[in-house]
Amino acid sequence: IQTPAAKYEQNGFWSDHWVYILDMVDTYLMVYPEKESHLLWDSAKVPFFMSPAYIKPRSERYVLVPNPDRSGTSTLRVLNAVVSETDTEYSLERYNEMKEIMNSSSYFADHTGAGSIWQRSAKDKDVFKVTIIAKLLMLGTLKFATLDPQGMGIEMEGGKPGWNDALNGLPGLLGSGMPETYECLRLIRYLRSSLEAYAVPHGSNKDSRPVVVPVEFHEFLDTIKGALTVYYSSDQKYDADIEYWTAASNAREQYREAILITFSGD
C-alpha cells in the first residue's frame, strides 16, 4: 500500500516544485485513459502537508534597505520570506498542533525521515482530505492568484526560485518566473477540459460531478473572482493592475491565515 509522505528540507519553497503534480496525472492517464473520472473524483482522497515552515505576509517579508546605487535612499527587497519552527515569531498554535499530531497514535514516520504531519480538520481532529480534482483546482487557483503585478510571472514568494541555483538572488528582488506561468496555464487548461467533460454546470450532463472544496478556499475563490470582475471592468492600466494584485495578495494571505492551524472541516 502506498502512503503519501512529505518532508520540508531547507529555508524556503522552490517556486516550481508543484509543476510535477500534473505530470503524475498525465503519466497515469497514459496507461489508464479510461479512468480519468475515477482518478479525479473517486480515487483515494489526498491530504495537505503541514510544513514546519510557512510564508510570511508581505508586511513582514518586504523591507527597505539602503540603495547601493544611490546614497541616502532606500530600495525594496524581500528578506527572510519564510518562518521556521526554530524562529521566535513562529506561531505557537501551529507548533502545538504539529506536536499533537506527532504524538497521536495515527502518526507515521518512514525510514527516510519524512512524516505524515497532515493538516487536520477542526471539526473532528481527523486528517483533512479532498479529491484529486479539488486539490488540482485549489493549486491552479492559488498559483493564478500569485501572478506578479504585471500579470506575467508567478512570484517567488517562498524565498526560492525554480530549479536553477543561478537565480537564487532573484526572490529577494521581488522576482517572478514565466516557466511557472506556462505550467499554471497548462494546469488551468487541463482543469477546464476535465470540468467540461465531467462537471458540466446547470445539470446539462446527468452524470456531472460536483467539486467539493474547503469553505476557506471557496471564500478565497469568490474573492479572486470579485477582484477579476473589478479589473475587467476597469481601464486595465497600471493602477488597475496594482489594485488587482493587491486584492489577490490580500486574499491569499487571508486564506493562509485561515488555515494556518487547521481546516474548519466545512
Residue ranges and their predicted role:
Residues 1-266:
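Acidic, mature catalytic/reactive cores of soluble proteins
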